Design a protein with these regions (language model features):
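A glycosyltransferase accessory/donor-loop signature
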Residues: 21-24, 29-37, 128-222
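Short, intrinsically disordered, charge-balanced linker/junction segments flanking boundaries
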Residues: 1-8, 20-22, 215
Length: 227
């Protein structure tokens, strides 16, 4: 619906603002399926289980970066509290990618505005990924593999084309799962991830950290559409 598209636009722009407001020397490029399809980079059928349009397209990041340098992928429901350059400072060339290795087992049967919650090992590891785009092992993760209908979401989201030693760790503060990690027991967040749903959904209007998100929306003069 136009309302859901409007909500999507708001939280994507808000997430981008939280990145660029604290980091002036970065480029942010949304993964838009229409653009990727136009460029013959993405041609998979719609994923019925996918809760976002980048369920599969996130794995095109190494190719989109011409298999060179480091790039960050993050879900669009994150609120960055700190300069993302401090995250890039953690990169280590021995790894093909780096992520928060959550021990996360959600209980909810649905998420995000009614989408089914799919349970699998390494849940949410792929929601914030530092990609070493030039790593030899990431040459396997190209448009042909990503678009192959036999390539499952579980294969990709578990990083199954990599050996375990090729996956580096970053501190959980950079992918702080709201409602899972707790302050002060687990420290303090550097990037808040509203993984179960955020204040842009009616049934999550007052979720944990809801006011931080609303304050950012107000500051950037974004308007929540009526539902």
């Amino acid at each position: 619906s136009s309302s859901s598209r409007g909500l999507g636009d708001v939280y994507k722009r808000q997430s981008k603002f939280s990145l660029t407001n604290k980091s002036t020397d970065i480029e942010v490029h949304p993964l838009k399926l229409t653009e990727l399809r136009d460029k013959q980079l993405y041609w998979r059928d719609e994923d019925k289980l996918g809760s976002t349009e980048f369920t599969f397209s996130r794995f095109l990041v190494p190719e989109l970066n011409n298999f060179k340098g480091w790039a960050l992928f993050c879900d669009c429901d994150l609120l960055f509290m700190e300069d993302v350059n401090n995250l890039f400072a953690l990169t280590d060339d021995q790894y093909a990618l780096m992520c928060v290795k959550h021990d996360y087992n959600p209980k909810e049967g649905t998420k995000m505005d009614g989408k089914q919650q799919t349970i699998y090992p390494r849940k949410n590891w792929s929601s914030v990924v530092l990609w070493n785009c030039g790593h030899e092992s990431n040459k396997k993760i190209n448009r042909e593999l990503v678009n192959n209908p036999d390539t499952t979401g579980k294969y990709l989201h578990r990083f199954s084309w990599l050996e375990d030693h090729e996956i580096g760790s970053i501190p959980h503060h950079w992918n702080w799962l709201a409602g899972w990690y707790e302050e002060p027991k687990d420290g303090t967040p550097k990037a808040i991830h509203y993984t179960e749903g955020g204040p842009w959904f009616e049934n999550y209007r007052f979720c944990e950290y809801h006011q931080l998100w609303k304050d950012t929306v107000s500051y950037t003069h974004l308007t929540l559409p009526t539902t």
